[in-house]
Amino acid sequence: EKDNTNAHICLLAKTEEGRRPLNDALSEANLTGFYGRPRVDIPLLLSLPRDDLWVTTACVAYWQYPDIDDITRRLADHFGSNFFLEVQAHNTDKQVMLNQHILELHAKTGIPLVMGCDSHYILEEDAQIRSDFLLSKGMNYPDEEGWYMDYPDGETVYERFARQGVLTHSQIVEAMENTNRFLAVEEYDGHREPPFTGRGGDLGILQSE
């Protein structure tokens, strides 16, 4: 029987030492982990360098497996303070129940909270453009009522969490402030790609073709 179950996770490279293994993991997922789509399994995640990546539990699509709490603890043990439980401010029963569960897990484990947005466009008025685009591709998501898909400012995010009524003031502030930790990325000038010299080192061949 086919099992197409999949879960989301957010991986962010802090440094070049994090980016390269992350790219390697994605390549490995395409080469040996492809089942319906490229898949990164738990051993591959746990092989990534703990100090050079940030990891968050992303959206509701992370919590798909019955043993996901145990998986979350394993990932938190590996990535330490670079691992976050992501809360979002959607006005839906599903997100409310998930945030309640996340807070329980946060209280038990001490894994820090971080705020995330499920942004599919920038401004609220762009929603129709996205709908038209999905329609042109024959795609339809019937259960999007109450889901915020714009890219809001901080004041709007806070107001949405407050209306949701799950997180306390201090928890909302903690989750929002923790997003600032992602600003501490390695900056560098120039390109890191290997030099491209063309087939056999002769660009004239490519130009002639």
What is the predicted role of each segment?
Residues 1-209:
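Phosphodiester-processing cores and adjacent nucleic acid-binding clamps
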